[in-house]
Every structure is written in structure tokens, then in C-alpha cells.
Regions:
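Hydrolases whose catalytic domains are alpha/beta-hydrolase-1, hotdog thioesterase
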Residues: 102-106
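N-terminal cap/lid segment of alpha/beta-hydrolase-fold proteins
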Residues: 1-11
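Conserved HGGG/HGGXW glycine-rich cap/lid loop of the alpha/beta-hydrolase fold
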Residues: 9-64
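Active-site loop/oxyanion-hole signature of alpha/beta-hydrolase fold enzymes
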Residues: 52-98, 251
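Alpha/beta-hydrolase
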Residues: 143-205, 221
Length: 263
């Protein structure tokens, strides 16, 4: 089922796949400014539960908002509105990169409405991320494209990545983050939820690639802060293990959802 959520700020496109009886999996893409495309493989989990994907406002198939509107609150309001619109009372929440930041903010506000939290290639402290990205960039001779090929996605011949790059909104990235991963000039400058991580008492899974922008130091911050978090590392992946090691990624997510629901 595809649909559109109409709001004053603009239309939000969404897709719900599957009608199984298990708790829905709600997925938050990264960026800021990217699209749902590289998350589409998660719909293979829809044989047992609804899988919900959407393009955040300003991105992909959703309506472009005005540049002055960009803020964390804007995207949190959109997420709340979408859950209300789709009657998603209790969900597993999965966020990658920026989507993981959004997932953390949402979980800190609405923990009781979540069954579990999956944090994929993400962070709790923007300054730490920028510092680690700068370190990684300094280790890569060559261009920024060479850096991205090593730490974002290691196989350029991928339809989902091509579509995402064609439909993403770089203005959102610039306004929310900045010109690159190691320079924060946007609304997320100073973003830091480390002190609040112990508030999260729900089951949590931290996922990352061995060559990820989400480095061991960044992951350690999440694992030490969230009481019931555990980690899985994908040895052949960088920042997009859902594409780089799809079968293992999906099996890992499925097994985690099972384990939570069996409690």
C-alpha cells in the first residue's frame, strides 16, 4: 500500500508492505536528505509483519519544504504524524545514520510505544562523528569520492544507490548537517544525546560495517550508554550493510525481532 500524508509543511510519501500479525517494522532513512530507496530490501521481512518505509519531507517522493523549515523538530513531528495516520501504536523502530539520530530522539520521547530499537550505522554525538570522519578522511589519499567509495558504499554498481542519489535533496543535508561529514554547520551542530542514553530501557541492537563511518569509538558510545544494547558488525561492509551484506543483515534483524517478541 502506497499513500501520502498531507500536512501544512508538505506531503509525505509512504509505503506499507505486508500484513503479518507481528509488530510492524518502521524504518527511518538517513541523510539528512536521502530517500527510502536503499532501505527497500528490508521489505523482504514483510512476509511476517508490515514494513513501513517513507521519504522524509523534502526528499524523494515527498514534497520539498522551504529551506528555512529544517530542524530536528520538523522530522520528529512528521514521524509522529505518520504513526498517527497509519495507526502504528506499537512498532519496532529501525534508523540508519541520520535516521538513527531521529530514532534516538523519538525513542527518548515515546519509548513506551516501541517494542525495540535498531540503530544502524549511527551515532549519539555529532561532534564525535565529525571528528571520526575527519580522521578517516585524512587516512584516505585522493578525492572525496575515493573516501566515499571506502566508507559509504564499496560497490558503485547498485540500482538502489543510484536512485537514492538521483532523488535525494542536498539542500536538506547542507541545512541540517553541512558541506561534508567532517564539517558541521547546520541545525545538528551541537547535537548530543549521550547523557540521555541510559533512559532507554528497551531492547536495542547496534549495527555497523567494519569499514563504516560509524567507527568502533562511535559504536562504543551507544553500547556503553544504552543499558540493553548489543552489537553486530558486518565485516565486508561500510556505511550501508543492508546493501553490502543483505542476506546477513536481514537475517540479523529478523533474529533480533524474534528474540524480542519471544520475551
Amino acid at each position: 500500500m502506497e499513500g501520502v500524508l498531507e500536512r501544512p509543511i508538505g506531503r509525505t510519501w509512504y509505503r506499507v508492505t505486508g500484513e503479518g500479525g507481528r509488530a510492524p517494522l518502521l524504518c527511518l532513512h538517513g541523510g539528512p536528505g536521502s530517500t527510502h530507496n536503499y532501505f527497500a530490501r528490508l521489505e523482504r521481512l514483510a512476509d511476517e509483519r508490515p514494513v513501513v518505509l517513507y521519504d522524509q519531507v523534502g526528499c524523494g517522493r515527498s514534497e520539498r519544504a522551504q529551506p528555512g523549515d529544517w530542524s530536528v523538530a520538523l522530522f520528529l513531528d512528521e514521524l509522529d504524524a505518520l504513526r498517527t495516520h497509519l495507526a502504528l501504536e506499537s512498532v519496532h523502530l529501525l534508523g540508519t545514520s541520520w535516521g538513527g539520530m531521529l530514532a534516538l530522539e523519538h525513542a527518548l520521547a515515546r519509548q513506551d510505544s516501541l517494542v525495540s530499537l535498531i540503530l544502524s550505522s549511527t551515532l549519539a554525538d555529532a561532534a564525535q562523528w565529525a571528528a571520526e570522519a575527519k580522521r578517516l578522511r585524512d587516512e584516505v589519499p585522493g578525492t572525496d569520492d575515493d573516501f566515499e567509495a571506502r566508507h559509504f558504499y564499496r560497490n558503485p554498481d547498485c540500482l538502489e544507490i543510484t536512485r537514492m542519489r538521483a532523488e535525494r535533496n542536498k539542500d536538506v543535508y547542507q541545512a541540517m548537517w553541512g558541506p561534508n561529514e567532517w564539517t558541521i554547520t547546520g541545525a545538528l551542530d551541537g547535537w548530543d544525546v549521550r547523557a540521555r542514553l541510559p533512559e532507554l530501557k528497551l531492547p536495542a541492537l547496534v549495527l555497523r560495517g567494519a569499514h563504516d563511518l560509524s567507527t568502533p569509538a562511535i559504536s562504543k558510545t551507544l553500547l556503553e550508554g544504552i543499558p540493553h544494547a548489543r552489537e553486530v558488525v558486518f565485516d565486508a561492509s561500510s556505511h550501508t550493510p543492508v546493501l553490502e551484506e543483505t542476506e546477513r543483515y536481514l537475517a540479523t534483524v529478523r533474529a533480533f525481532l524474534y528474540s524480542v517478541e519471544a520475551r
